[in-house]
Amino acid sequence: MVKDSSYTLADVRVGEEDGIPFVETEGTEDFDLRAVMECGQCFRFTPVAGTSHRCEYSGVAYGRFISVAEDEGTLRFYNTDIQEFGSLWIGYFGLDTDYAAIKRDILSRSDRPVLGEAVAAGGGIRILRQDAWEALCSFIISQNNNIPRI
């Protein structure tokens, strides 16, 4: 894993919308919220209907309810504060991992062209750092299913 040492809490903005606190971050590379939430690695987040954002998902992770919205180059995390965002959500969503560097490294390996195809197909997906028990249960339950069926 390549840590993105350039990502700090100084890169975020805090605010409140309709009485709900949020933390907003801009410039997150290689992040597609819809792709992350729909790729089959988590099952406790659902799309928010009627959102004013390009896409928004709400759900529970580590016992905390959160709603995450994405617009062009901006992620907004509702129902959290700067401390919780720094200690939980940065790691959960892999915002501290330099996915662009990982992609460059994979694409530079001309001996494995199939990896380049995988990178292109999975653009924007992040590996969520989920609670181990939740990930295990989701894996076991989904063994007889496929992603479209789930």
Identify the residue ranges that each predicted region occupies.
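HhH-family (HhH-GPD) DNA N-glycosylase catalytic core used in base-excision repair
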Residues: 1-150
